[in-house]
């Protein structure tokens, strides 16, 4: 059935035209297979699964969360032709791009707060991954990143209901694990065996025709 958002007391349906996920198990097919067998999905997303749909330039240039979000978006929109791609991006994340944040701060402290990487600075802001997805899909509409703890994905969906109009859009929720910062934000992530990250994406439209 459709994903529904309430607006002014009215239920608005969005239909799923594409989906993808990345977990410790791997890509969507591996994740669904393990779920069907009741197996645990913990662990970090394998780099091979995260990078296999990406252009080589993106693999070289992007770090973990931006790579994850772009991979999720490309997989969710697989087979879609130009003119039938998302025109808006809505991204929910709790912690944002931890790899770039750590690397920017580490280099800054190493140089007595004099120098660091402009690339890491740009990549460290929360909306950088959604920006990469918008650039890839040439999405001219709203590009919104929501940070609301465990409700980030839900809030991103609500934002889409308010802002997207009739345009198709990409809804993504993802977070990365970083060995330096994740344990500081979440004490339960302090041991390597609990290191877990991943995300999911839905390509949504108000039109039912062609929905999965």
What is the meaning of each model-derived region?
Residues 1-142, 148-154, 162-168, 174-212:
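Conserved "HGTGT" condensation-loop signature of ketosynthase/thiolase-family condensing enzymes
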Residues 157:
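Short-chain dehydrogenase/reductase
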């Amino acid at each position: 059935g459709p994903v529904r958002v309430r607006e002014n007391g009215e239920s608005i349906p969005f239909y799923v035209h594409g989906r993808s996920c990345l977990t410790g198990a791997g890509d969507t097919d591996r994740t669904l297979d393990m779920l069907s067998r009741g197996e645990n999905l913990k662990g970090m997303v394998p780099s091979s699964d995260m990078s296999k749909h990406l252009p080589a330039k993106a693999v070289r240039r992007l770090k973990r969360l931006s790579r994850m979000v772009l991979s999720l978006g490309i997989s969710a929109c697989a087979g879609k032709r130009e003119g039938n791609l998302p025109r808006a991006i809505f991204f929910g994340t709790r912690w944002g791009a931890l790899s770039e944040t750590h690397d920017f701060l580490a280099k800054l402290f190493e140089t007595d707060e004099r120098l660091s990487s402009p690339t890491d600075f740009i990549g460290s802001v929360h909306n950088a991954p959604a920006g990469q997805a918008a650039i890839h899909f040439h999405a001219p509409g709203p590009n919104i990143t929501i940070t609301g703890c465990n409700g980030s994905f839900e809030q991103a969906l609500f934002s889409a209901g308010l802002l997207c109009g009739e345009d198709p859009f990409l809804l993504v929720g993802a977070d990365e694990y970083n060995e330096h910062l994740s344990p500081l934000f979440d004490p339960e992530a302090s041991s390597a065996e609990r290191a877990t990250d991943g995300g999911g994406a839905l390509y949504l439209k108000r039109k039912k025709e062609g929905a999965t």
